[in-house]
Design a protein with these regions (language model features):
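Bacterial N-terminal signal peptides that target proteins for export
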Residues: 1-6
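N-terminal signal peptide c-region/cleavage motif recognized by signal peptidases
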Residues: 12-16
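Active-site-proximal alpha-helix that buttresses catalytic centers in soluble enzyme cores
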Residues: 20-111, 115-118, 127, 157-182
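Generic beta-sheet signal
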Residues: 31-33, 138-146
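...with weaker cross-activation on analogous glycine-rich loops/strands in unrelated enzymes
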Residues: 125-135
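A short, structured loop/turn motif at beta-sheet edges
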Residues: 135-140, 170
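Residues that scaffold the ATP/ADP-binding catalytic core of kinase and kinase-like folds
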Residues: 154
Length: 182
């Protein structure tokens, strides 16, 4: 049983590394949209007294999350992956990920906030994100810092904290071109 587990582990590691390398190749070329899940946080859900305008009422980046965000930015620079714009959810964990990683103030983009509970509101958020993605035609990359739920709804992919999913429009949805883990 242990041999099987080790063999399985050894098969998975090269796939993850290959996916990351392929993702970096895309990002170096520019012109792509990156859905970046915020870096590691201190908890699992926002408290009952949540206020979008107060970081004290939200879960925030942990010390490891801040290090991870710094690593994200360092790797974008080291891998020569050009960035044209950074859009972010208004949640502090997303804003801080963007600020630390890219050393600039991101553009607030409310549709990247956690998806609302109401189906009509969710659909409106997804439509606004898709409109932004479809309209993007820059030569460098567009980074959109958001949440797990948003990325899953857009792509069907469940990224880890701080993972980047590179996408392009395809039909009514998105096609995942690559992923980069940090």
């Amino acid at each position: 049983m242990i041999r099987f587990a080790l063999a399985l582990f050894m098969l998975v590691i090269p796939v993850a590394a290959h996916a990351t390398d392929a993702g970096w190749a895309l990002l170096r070329d520019g012109g792509h949209v990156v859905l970046l899940r915020h870096a590691m946080v201190t908890g699992t859900s926002d408290p009952a007294n949540f206020d979008i305008d107060s970081c004290a009422t939200q879960i925030n980046l942990s010390a490891r999350g801040k290090q991870q965000a710094s690593k994200i930015g360092a790797l974008f620079a080291a891998r020569a992956a050009p960035i044209e714009r950074v859009l972010s959810s208004r949640y502090c964990r997303c804003l801080d990920t963007a600020r630390i990683a890219f050393e600039a103030e991101p553009e607030l983009f409310a549709p990247l906030d956690l998806l609302k509970g109401d189906d009509a509101q969710k659909a409106a958020q997804i439509a606004a994100i898709m409109k932004e993605i479809r309209a993007y035609s820059g030569s460098d990359n567009l980074v959109m810092v958001t949440h797990l739920e948003d990325i899953v709804a857009l792509t069907g992919v469940s990224p880890r904290e701080g993972e980047a999913v590179i996408v392009e429009p395809q039909g009514d949805g998105l096609r995942v071109l690559g992923r980069v883990t940090f």
